[in-house]
Amino acid sequence: MHLTRLNIERVRNLKTVALHGLQPFNVFYGANGSGKTSILEAIHLLATGRSFRTHIPKNYIQYEADDAIVFAQSATEKIGMQKLASGEQLMKVNGDTVATQGQLAKLLPLQHIDPQSTDIIDHGAKPRRQLLDWLMFHVEPEFYFAWQYYSRALKQRNTLLKTRRNLSLADLEPWNKMLSDYGEILHSQRLSIVEQWNVYFQNDLSQLLPDLEIELEYSPGFHTEQGLMQDLLNQHQKDIERRYTEYGPHRADLRLKTPFGHADDVLSRGQKKLLIIALKLSQIAMLHASNKETVVLLDDLTAELDLTAQQRLIERLSQLGSQVFMTTLDHASVKKHLHDLSISYQLFSVESGQVSLAAP
């Protein structure tokens, strides 16, 4: 879904923003604090229901306002989101109210590339698991269904473990069965997708870090040789003592291994940033291969990447048919990259929350 129109109301210092005639690449420049990143934040809110900067709606809803609204239009779809300060939200697709955020997310596959962040590598399994599940959601049709049932059973089982101390196997049996059934499905789906993803990943890794050898290794979160049900039965008493479920796909990890150890231990900060970009580009490539185009948010491109890496990233995103919304302090170098690569783009100047077209 490529956006042709974007309206933003009451997101941080953006009181009213109306953008038309959006291009494959849309570049927002201005001083720090002008509101550039808030534009990306608003698009992220529309696609995912949350900000990438804070989990608290009142922190991004304009001061003394009750809500924030983001609306976008493509050649075929209209989608909108109203977020209340309470956290409640109203979502619409083509004028009809929809019940789940997933319905918007399916229409608007979105990747946020932040060249300053190394969280995916340095901050434990959760962000890597989320990265994998983003891909699963968009390329494996049955994943969301299985994940919903698994998550529901996990929540119920953990509630029992937290509230009751003398639980028998019979008490947990219904949840064990549901966790086992859907957990095995999730494991099988993830294993297949990681194998496919690794092919795309190696291609993008070779372009950004040609001297590095890195493999994606999926760790399922339970002992696959005996199965999840056996782990749940074996860990029954320990789970009661811990008050949570230790084994299952919710504990999975995507390990990034080099011949010299794990990526978080052996790579430099600069290498980690390029590795994360390669991971996300390869996911975008996998969607592109199934005729799904991704909207990409690219924050502060020129701050962390050298000129060669900047040009390679822009060129690759263009090859993959992505629509890009990027922020920069140095729009001159970005303009040069786009001109050199003959990419259609639009410049926007941002000043104190006001966004205006700028000369290309």
Curated annotation (Swiss-Prot):
Any one of the GO CC terms: cytoplasm
GO molecular function: ATP binding; single-stranded DNA binding
Superkingdom classification of source: Bacteria
Any single Pfam family the record assigns to this protein: SMC_N
GO terms under biological process: DNA replication; DNA synthesis involved in DNA repair; double-strand break repair; SOS response
Signal peptide: none
Main location: cytoplasm
Coiled-coil boundaries: none
Family membership: Belongs to the RecF family.
Role, per record: The RecF protein is involved in DNA metabolism; it is required for DNA replication and normal SOS inducibility. RecF binds preferentially to single-stranded, linear DNA. It also seems to bind ATP.
Protein name: DNA replication and repair protein RecF
